[in-house]
């Protein structure tokens, strides 16, 4: 097509732009398979990958109060007694789309927060802070019903099953799954968390676990999940990581750290973790500056 453009007063120009490159056309029209059109030799570190913060925080808590509407989800009963009958969705809800809808929209990195309630657990519920997140897809919720209902919670095993099903149907894609130890003021249950996460990943994602190296390509990861886990759990997995270990420092504006795999090599990474934003222009400025710093880092 041809379009006019004014570059300076009194001078007019025109220029022609050809068709969109074939890869870009495919990516724009098919978000469920956008990665398969990228070249195999593209480094994973070169790709801008859409991600989902607290990916399971879709409906809030697994407790429902009275109205039966998805936007009326509430925290635990004891938290309700503390807050009163106040809609606490703003505290827990972070997403509008289900896991399946996020995958179909092109999201490829998912932030999961499993919680260990004891030192010996078989499966892990997904949390947002202190709140167990409800999963209506698993039943236990009757729209329009009166009184409190208990939704089935999101469980790590079943979220991983959904990821594996997606990769079976879309083998050209890859997923990144970030995990951290959630909802605890002590490390009393850390060993149980480590063992449960390792067991769950191995049993649910057998043959789908991507090995991390700093120069891994898309070909190395197609049809697989690259786990990026903040906890150093390798002593509970025979001295090896399942994917990458992310050495993390909490609540810093911007910090540099490393990703580690099993090859002994480390990849540098810059993180913006300024999440505790208060009202006020100065906090917003700090957040935007931190984002800009990280974006600039990716181009250097």
Language-model features: where?
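Glycogenin-like
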Residues: 144-212
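Short, well-ordered coil/turn segments that N-cap beta-strands
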Residues: 106-108, 171-175, 221-225
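Catalytic domains of cell-wall/extracellular-matrix polysaccharide-remodeling enzymes
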Residues: 184-233, 238-247
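A short, solvent-exposed beta-strand micro-motif common in secreted/extracellular proteins
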Residues: 1-2
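C-terminal active-site rim and adjoining tail of enzyme catalytic domains
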Residues: 228-300
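Solvent-exposed loop/turn segments at secondary-structure junctions
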Residues: 53-55, 109, 114-118, 181-186, ...
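Long, acidic (Asp/Glu-rich), low-complexity accessory segments flanking structured domains
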Residues: 7-105, 118-169, 174, 233
């Amino acid at each position: 097509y041809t379009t006019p453009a004014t570059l300076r007063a009194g001078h007019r120009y025109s220029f022609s732009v050809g068709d969109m490159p074939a890869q870009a056309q495919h990516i724009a029209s098919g978000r469920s398979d956008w990665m398969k059109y990228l070249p195999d030799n593209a480094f994973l570190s070169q790709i801008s990958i859409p991600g989902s913060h607290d990916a399971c925080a879709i409906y809030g808590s697994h407790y429902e109060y009275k109205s039966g509407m998805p936007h009326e989800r509430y925290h635990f009963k004891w938290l309700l007694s503390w807050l009163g009958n106040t809609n606490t969705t703003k505290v827990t809800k972070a997403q509008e789309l289900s896991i399946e809808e996020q995958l179909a929209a092109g999201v490829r990195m998912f932030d999961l927060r499993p919680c260990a309630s004891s030192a010996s657990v078989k499966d892990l519920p997904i949390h947002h802070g202190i709140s167990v997140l409800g999963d209506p897809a698993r039943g236990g919720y009757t729209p329009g019903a009166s009184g409190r209902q208990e939704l089935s919670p999101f469980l790590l095993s079943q979220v991983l099953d959904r990821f594996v099903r997606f990769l079976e149907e879309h083998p050209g894609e890859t997923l990144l799954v970030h995990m951290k130890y959630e909802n605890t003021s002590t490390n009393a249950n850390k060993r149980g968390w480590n063992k449960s996460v390792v067991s769950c990943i191995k049993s649910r994602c057998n043959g789908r676990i991507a090995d991390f190296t700093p120069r891994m390509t898309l070909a190395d990861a197609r049809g697989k999940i690259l786990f990026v886990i903040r906890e150093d759990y390798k002593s509970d997995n025979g001295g090896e990581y399942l994917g990458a270990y992310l050495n993390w420092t909490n609540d810093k504006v911007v910090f540099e750290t490393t990703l580690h795999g099993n090859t002994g090599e480390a990849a540098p990474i810059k993180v913006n973790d300024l999440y505790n934003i208060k009202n006020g222009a100065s906090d917003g400025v700090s957040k935007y500056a931190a984002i800009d710093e990280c974006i600039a880092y990716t181009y250097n």
